[in-house]
Amino acid sequence: MNNPKKKTATGSSQKKVSKKGPSFDDVKKIPGQLKTRAQVLVLMLEVQKGASLQHSLDRAFQDFSPQERGFALELLMGSLRDYIPLQMEVRKCLAKPLKSSGKWLEALLVLGAYQLTSMNTPARAVIHSMVEIVRTLGYDHLVGLANGVLRGVQRNIEAANRKLKPLAIHDYLNEGHWLHAELFKNWRKCRIS
């Protein structure tokens, strides 16, 4: 019979989380900032299953410091808000779709993609923390997949940023060419830049 305990890189044995994904009990043993990210993953999974966001937040925030609450709320709300585009970005970096039992991993990768795209967190820190969560939860065989997908997302973001051209003044002031021309004609010395 298969033993549910698995040896980690540090030599300690730990139980794999269920196929449905981690629970609050699974992430309690995770140390420091990784614990915050892992709890946000559990919150996201609960909300996706139909749980009340407010009830889940109240339960999770009992363990958070005020600083962790702000980070967790930004990460959770931003990831949920941008879930579909982030999910598409993650899926572009996968060779084949994840199985239905891997939805928790996809949610974790979406959290990582949100941090890479929208938060001011260094890419190496984001990738390392997401990979460490996978490893700590006992899924050593998925570490390479998580690392590769997040590095792919990082490369796609960098490529998209290189393609961006500087905006003309009428683009970021949300005014037409004609208005900009009139303003420039009448107030030539007052330049907006």
Language model feature labels by segment:
Residues 1-193:
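Class I Rossmann-like S-adenosyl-L-methionine
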